[in-house]
Amino acid sequence: MSFLPLRSRSRSGAPHWVYIILYHIFTIPKIYSLPLLSGSHVLNSRDVADSGHSVGDEASVTTYYIISIILVLLGGVFAGLTLGLMGQDEVYLKVISTSGSNSEKKLAKRVLDLISRGKHWVLVTLLLSNVITNETLPIVLDRCLGGGWQAVVSSTILIVIFGEIIPQSVCVKYGLQVGAFFCPFVLVLMYLMYPVAYPIATLLDYMLGEDHGTMYKKSGLKTLVTLHRTMGVERLTKDEVTIISAVLDLKAKRVEEIMTPIENVFTMSADTILDDKTVEKIFNSGFSRIPIFLPNEPNNFIGMLLVRVLISYDPDDCLPISHFPLATLPETSPNTSCLNILNYFQEGKAHMCVVSKEPGSSHGAIGVLTLEDVIEELIGEEIVDESDVFVDMHQHIMRQQPGPLSKRHITSYLHHLYTSSHKEHKAADQADESSPLLSPSNSNHPSEHPQQDLNNKSWKQKSNDGYDRSNAVLSPTPQVTEHGTIIPSNLASNPLNVNKSFVTIKKPANVPKIITTHTPHSSKEPSPAPHSNDKSLSAEEQQLLSDHAELSRQAVLHTQRSGQPTQVTTSTKTTRNSPDSISIPNSGANHGNENQNVTISTSYQNTKNGIVESVITVKGVPKTIIGPAKDWDESKSEYGNENINQENSNRSDDRESSSSNASLFSSIKNKFKNENANNNDRSNFTDSLSRTSNYDANGSSSTIKR
């Protein structure tokens, strides 16, 4: 046997077997590092460990199982709360907290208190907690199931079923209850994760903005109300849906759309004699308010006749309509909102108005609007009372069945009621009797002193009609003032109190303060000349306008600073009639020789209910004009909240009021000239021009009477 190869040497001098041994030493770790051999080696090592301890430490395995179950439940809670709390609309929660049941109010207040701390803060806290839980679960299951694909599959199944599907399905239906129950737990987590969650939530608020819930437009609200008719537990009826939808459209709807055209309106002239035929015609018309116009001017309305005034009138007296007190008949433009006109009707001043293209002029009337028209628009149906002849005035649909009292006998019935009541009062106690409106002996010639023809006795009563008349002095006929003007016993400016809690009467505004300046006439100065047809104002009248403009500017500043209504009046002499009374001009009266006076009156009042009321007297006829206020519903801030910016606003108001007064009195001069030029058209009536307007802090108004 030859040992030559073993003894052979390399060029370096080292034997070959040395290299072979070193090669095997360095390649052994690479072979055993393969996955198959490595796994079998680990498995063999565990078998060796299991052979000494059988199944292993059962206590630690049980602990891992319990931790896994807790993590699965926490993941489900976080996933459900994310949907339950974030899915709650803040507006819906506010509605439930005020109008829900007692239990719903408590739950909604808990959730609102949590969300009010920051909706993004709650969201980041829940998402961060859910991620931590889901990432920890596979690690714990690896200790229980031995790792590998078993832990991955098990954690996935548990998270999907018990951490997502079941919790979110429950919270979709019971999100409010579940969210309110876990509110304390979520609040603790929010503060535990404050260092991480709050900065992220602040960044989201800055980038995305805060979410305060879903707000609907009017069209969306109408759709929502309509859906409540067919869906939900408490379904709305058809009438409820109609009324709610009509209310939402009331502000955008114009009075021109619901008015009665002027050609379909029952009107009468002021010189109409109320005989048997005319009274029967009035009662057969079925109207309780009749617009009255000047003779030969069918579009120049001076007021409205309340039919109830004729309840004690004897048609044999044959008195003209101008003899009776007429209620104020305001005028408004066709573009006035129905909501604004409804607010005006609620003030108790009038329940009828004239729709005119040129409010305040002697022409331009296109229709009439009543409170009943607005209410009919609200309910979407026609209202037919006992005395109505037409079911629908616009379509001329007459009612098929008459009212409770036949129209054919109503005149004779009222006449019989009047005469029988008169006889009973004569036979009754003298303390309780009341005389008729006019003495029968003077029926054809009315007394020159109507107050002497009325009984001065009055009584106090409390009837079952809902009105408290204990503090009101009433009379069976309209009262007569010291100026001879007949006014109703229950004035709209001072309505009676109502005992019923469900009835509300809006009281008129307080009487404004008066700032009056007079221009005295000495004995040397000539009295004001009678009215002429000059087309220019005299120097004295222009000076009055200039002085009044300065006083008006000061009054505007006073009203803006104090918030109190103010009135400025400048006159050349004291007027005989009360400014609040309305005198109806009588035909045939000669006013050409009477001394004329000039009265300029400006009133400043806070605008209410979105309307500005003005009074214009054209050719002796006072007209009330109703117009919408500018941005009235966006400017309701109290005076006390504007103290900081008051100084700056007063400076700007000085400039604005000066310019507004200049333009205002310029227009008054022009209109005054135009009226003077056209006075020959009606020489038998009092020639006058008057303008009074109510303004808030945004403007002013003026009155001129000539």
Curated annotation (Swiss-Prot):
InterPro entries: ACDP (IPR045095), CBS_dom (IPR000644), CBS_dom_sf (IPR046342), CNNM (IPR002550), Ion_transp-like_CBS (IPR044751). Residues 259-320, 321-386 form the CBS domain. The keyword Disulfide bond does not apply. GO terms for biological process: intracellular magnesium ion homeostasis; intracellular manganese ion homeostasis; mitochondrion organization. It is found in: Vacuole membrane. GO terms for molecular function: transmembrane transporter activity. Residues 433-445, 566-575, 658-680 have a biased composition (Low complexity). Keywords: Membrane, Phosphoprotein, Repeat, Transmembrane, Transmembrane helix, Vacuole. Residues 630-639 have a biased composition (Basic and acidic residues). Residues 38-65, 142-145, 199-706 are cytoplasmic. Its main location: membrane. Residues 1-16, 87-120, 167-177 are vacuolar. Residues 421-495, 515-540, 557-597, 626-706 are annotated as: Disordered. Residues 472-495, 576-597, 681-706 have a biased composition (Polar residues). It is a multi-pass membrane protein. The modification Phosphothreonine is found at T607. Involved in metal homeostasis and more specially in manganese sensitivity. Present with 2270 molecules/cell in log phase SD medium. This is Protein MAM3. It comes from Saccharomyces cerevisiae (strain ATCC 204508 / S288c). The lineage of its organism: Eukaryota, Fungi, Dikarya, Ascomycota, Saccharomycotina.
